[in-house]
């Protein structure tokens, strides 16, 4: 066990809460002490939900440990069923309750409830949140479909059956959850995209799905695995038991969306899509080619996040924006293999770690010009003075925008371009700031319009204060002022030839050079010598 002030993932029961909260008609009874109820805030504060998660806590206390905590569990199960009347009941335990070994799932299964009861055993001390969400979704789908008498294990499932049935092909979108990164907007974008290609969305799960919707999953022609961390285990089970194929490409970025559509059309035996659709529908390809080449090309970028978004970001950065990827990693150990493979293709060694300090150290060593990461990478990048864009959970409330802001599909590519490029400085802007960095507008001690309320002293005030307390400082300043070199008419004429927006910097640099060289007068030759000196 490690003491830390930040974690990329919560314990697995938080993942189970994400599944229960994402769905309708599902209730989760969690055997947990009072302190584990903190997870409610993740949904009401971060996700800005208008209602609490559908979770009942047993909230046992220390004094309860001397009695029969199993009876406490049964009491809360009865209360939850009577009060909420769920269509499906999830039962599990938190990391603390796991030590008591009450096995609440087994208790609930023997209580004769008239709805599906799914007990979830999540190893809290070896697995984490995303695995818990994946396992919960898998167990819920398996538990509900196993109640169907029509289940035929190993039955052949033809993705092209829609042709003989005289209907449009239909697919399931699996994996979006609450506390996922822009999942709700991704679904809207994909529904629109698939409809344009003549494909219907049959079921979206777990987000906003009901248990009855899960029973309809096998009626689709294939499954779309949008977030492998959450849905891959379920897709594999549906493939084994119902013969349902599933897509492997996550449509984040122009190239990936193009590959995604080609994969779907091939699986569904539909005509190939228009290969030029990406350039027609998304602005990213043209924008990335039309901007100042110094703006994007060769920018060093460090990428860290969940496996799905880190892999997508690496492809977009390398192939679509012309960035140079100098770091790639993930905290999702379940996605370590594909991330390592992607890093190897880029000539890198992947960083697989859930230690934010190790990530910050790798970031500092890579010295990128842009960081693409989670909320913690935003903090680390700020400490290092590096621009950052958040591409993955865990995220802050500001990364749950009110506007429509998908990551997938053609519009998602537009959003990604804006999100990644805005933290960077334009080439001309960067050049001008470099030239004017020492001008008074950029001096840290520049007087604020709120200066009368207190705050930092101006540079002049600081010098006067120092001079008042240290007479030698005043005399040194006077002598320095007396020794300032004089500009000859020839030197002033040469200075006038320099563009106005850099003239101040050239004047200061020339005077600095003249003092160092011991020149009492500045003529045209001194200006040229200073220019050579500061360029060297």
Curated annotation (Swiss-Prot):
Active site (record annotation): 292
Listed Low complexity bias regions: 448-469
InterPro entries, per database record: ChlB/BchB/BchZ, LI-POR_suB-like_C, Nase/OxRdtase_comp1, P-CP_red_C, Protochl_reductB, Protochlorophyllide_Rdtase
Reactions listed under catalytic activity: chlorophyllide a + oxidized 2[4Fe-4S]-[ferredoxin] + 2 ADP + 2 phosphate = protochlorophyllide a + reduced 2[4Fe-4S]-[ferredoxin] + 2 ATP + 2 H2O
EC numbers, comma separated: 1.3.7.7
Ranges of Polar residues composition bias in the record: 470-483
Residues given in the record as substrate binding sites: 427-428
Pathway: Porphyrin-containing compound metabolism; chlorophyll biosynthesis (light-independent)
Top-level division of the source organism's lineage: Bacteria
Residues at which [4Fe-4S] cluster binds: 36
Keyword field: 4Fe-4S, ATP-binding, Chlorophyll biosynthesis, Iron, Iron-sulfur, Metal-binding, Nucleotide-binding, Oxidoreductase, Photosynthesis
Residue span of region Disordered: 448-489
Co-factor binding details: Binds 1 [4Fe-4S] cluster per heterodimer. The cluster is bound at the heterodimer interface by residues from both subunits.
Single Gene Ontology BP annotation: photosynthesis, dark reaction
Coiled coil: none
Cofactor annotation: [4Fe-4S] cluster
HAMAP family noted in UniProt: ChlB_BchB
Family: Belongs to the ChlB/BchB/BchZ family.
Chain's role: Component of the dark-operative protochlorophyllide reductase (DPOR) that uses Mg-ATP and reduced ferredoxin to reduce ring D of protochlorophyllide (Pchlide) to form chlorophyllide a (Chlide). This reaction is light-independent. The NB-protein (ChlN-ChlB) is the catalytic component of the complex.
Quaternary structure note: Protochlorophyllide reductase is composed of three subunits; ChlL, ChlN and ChlB. Forms a heterotetramer of two ChlB and two ChlN subunits.
Protein name: Light-independent protochlorophyllide reductase subunit B
UniProt gene name: chlB
